[in-house]
Amino acid sequence: MAMNTETLSLIKQSIKTIPNYPKEGILFRDVTSLLENAAAYKATIDLLVEQYRNKGFTKIVGTEARGFLFGAPLALELGIGFVPVRKPGKLPRATISQSYELEYGHDSLEIHTDAITANDKVLVVDDLLATGGTIEATVKLIRQLGGEVQDAAFVISLPDLGGEARLTALGLELVKLCEFEGE
């Protein structure tokens, strides 16, 4: 489905670039500036609704924390459940965990064991795709619980960091509203 170029431009222009944050040489893409712009935020959710309406999804999974900001409103608009994937120790019921590699070490994510069933067709939503490590871990959690996941949506993609290739290798179809070069 072709997306409106004018709307995509509004979204991309609302994302501020912060040089040398969090460290020297990084161009940080600040999605919080998009959230501050009601028209751009609404346009983002509306585009995702248009993209995924009537596709048969039963759940949206969002990864902590900014995935919640786009996944939850999308789930409401689609009339389906939202499932948060969180850092360890943040979910109150029984969970499963998946580790993933960071630049310097590793971390892990958790999901409630009863949040996804074998009947669920799941869309993963996050704000930014960089290396793909957190989304790969999220997909593994969903699949471990028996959910079907073949789609992931992102507001921002940084294709130079390899995440797109990593996730397509997992069999995911990706929707990215904005792409930025560099790190």
UniProtKB/Swiss-Prot annotation:
- Matching NCBIfam families: apt, PRK02304.1-1, PRK02304.1-3, PRK02304.1-5
Query: Which pathway does the UniProt entry assign to this protein?
Result: Purine metabolism; AMP biosynthesis via salvage pathway; AMP from adenine: step 1/1
What role does this protein play? Catalyzes a salvage reaction resulting in the formation of AMP, that is energically less costly than de novo synthesis.
Localization, UniProt: Cytoplasm
Q: Which family does it belong to?
A: Belongs to the purine/pyrimidine phosphoribosyltransferase family.
Look up and give the organism this protein is from. Answer: Shewanella sp. (strain ANA-3)
Q: Which reaction does it catalyse?
A: AMP + diphosphate = 5-phospho-alpha-D-ribose 1-diphosphate + adenine
Spell out the protein name for this chain.
Answer: Adenine phosphoribosyltransferase
Subunit field text: Homodimer.
Q: Which Gene3D superfamilies match?
A: 3.40.50.2020
Q: Could you say which EC number(s) this protein's record lists?
A: 2.4.2.7
Which SUPFAM superfamilies does the UniProt entry name for this protein? PRTase-like (SSF53271)
Q: What's a GO biological-process term for it? A: AMP salvage
A Pfam match is Pribosyltran
Q: Which domain of life is it from?
A: Bacteria
Q: Which PANTHER family match?
A: ADENINE PHOSPHORIBOSYLTRANSFERASE (PTHR32315:SF3)
- Recorded GO MF terms: adenine binding; adenine phosphoribosyltransferase activity; AMP binding
Q: Which GO terms describe its cellular component?
A: cytoplasm
**Chain's gene name:** apt
Keywords attached to this Swiss-Prot or TrEMBL record, sorted alphabetically, are:
Cytoplasm, Glycosyltransferase, Purine salvage, Transferase
